[in-house]
Amino acid sequence: MSRIAKYPVELPKGVEASIQPDQITVKGPLGILVQSLTGDVNVAQEDGKLTFVVANDSRHANAMSGTLRALVANMVTGVSKGFERKLNLVGVGYRAQIQGDAVKLQLGFSHDVVHQLPAGVKAECPTQTEIVIKGPNKQVVGQVAAEIRKYREPEPYKGKGVRYADERVVIKETKKK
């Protein structure tokens, strides 16, 4: 059995999990998330905890039990607390603002970049150079942050661009004569 899958996932108050043969659904105050199940892992719910047991002794089933446990733990955290990713815009004239369910970015191009947000993901701009992306699904929040960062990645000489708040950009030295 996987070392990660040995530990059960505790369900906090206000979070419910329903298990069908082919999927698990987690409901909480921030939304509903669904994860498909494989036949290699059996999921059981008892006393407010979810346990993951390997159905057969293959290496694939062992790996899937740990993966599934981590995904379900992220689902439980997502529907109870949520996930967020912070982005900083570094550069002269770089700005962001929220327009409905889209983020409008001014990144030094001749045009503004408008990024549509998927369902379930919210964004806010505490300042013109900060974007906070929030949502219950960790994968989708990270994907949206990566897509926004991709419009103008930090360049290595001045560090201008869109970067994660916890990202450290290594600045190169310019060529000397």
Swiss-Prot record:
Q: Which GO terms describe its biological process?
A: cytoplasmic translation
Extract the Pfam families matched here.
Ribosomal_L6
User: Which InterPro entries has this protein been placed in?
Assistant: Ribosomal_uL6-like, Ribosomal_uL6-like_a/b-dom_sf, Ribosomal_uL6_a/b-dom, Ribosomal_uL6_bac-type, Ribosomal_uL6_CS
Molecular function via GO: rRNA binding; structural constituent of ribosome
Q: Which residues form the signal peptide?
A: none
PROSITE patterns documented for this protein = RIBOSOMAL_L6_1 (PS00525)
Query: Quaternary structure?
Result: Part of the 50S ribosomal subunit.
Q: What is this protein called?
A: Large ribosomal subunit protein uL6
What organism, scientifically named, is this protein from? Bordetella pertussis (strain Tohama I / ATCC BAA-589 / NCTC 13251)
